[in-house]
Design a protein with these regions (language model features):
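Short C-terminal boundary/hinge segments that cap the last helix of small helical domains
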Residues: 67-69, 85-96
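A short, Lys/Arg-rich alpha-helix, primarily the initiator
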Residues: 1-41
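DNA major-groove recognition helix of helix-turn-helix/homeodomain DNA-binding modules
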Residues: 73-88
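Surface-exposed polar/charged interaction patches
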Residues: 16-23, 45, 65, 82
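Intrinsically disordered regulatory regions flanking bHLH/HLH domains
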Residues: 19-26, 48, 55, 88-94
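Recognition helix of helix-turn-helix/homeodomain-like DNA-binding domains
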Residues: 26-29, 41-71
Length: 96
């Protein structure tokens, strides 16, 4: 079974942010703190405002259905940038 690229991208972003928060000494690293940091980075780096609650909803959707697809291209581009690429399409070239 082929792995869902949206889930892989989301998981990669979560791992990057989780490591950053732990290195920074954040006392409580959990879904809310990770989603808040991701939302802040997407807003700062990509100019697209997204609520941390929306990201936590995506997280839950992936837990229920590993084939879930993030419906917003701007979020995908922001996650791709957070993962060190220009955007989602650039990230996808390295994923495939």
């Amino acid at each position: 079974m082929k792995q869902n690229d949206h889930k892989k991208l989301f998981d990669e972003a979560v791992n990057i942010v989780k490591a950053h928060l732990e290195d920074k000494g954040t006392v409580k690293v959990n879904k809310t703190s990770i989603a808040t940091e991701i939302a802040d980075r997407i807003a700062q780096n990509h100019g697209f405002p997204i609520a941390e609650r929306t990201l936590r909803n995506y997280w839950g959707d992936f837990e229920k259905n590993p084939n879930y697809r993030i419906p917003t291209g701007e979020v995908l581009d922001g996650l791709g940038k957070l993962c060190g690429r220009e955007d989602y399409a650039d990230w996808l070239r390295y994923f495939k």
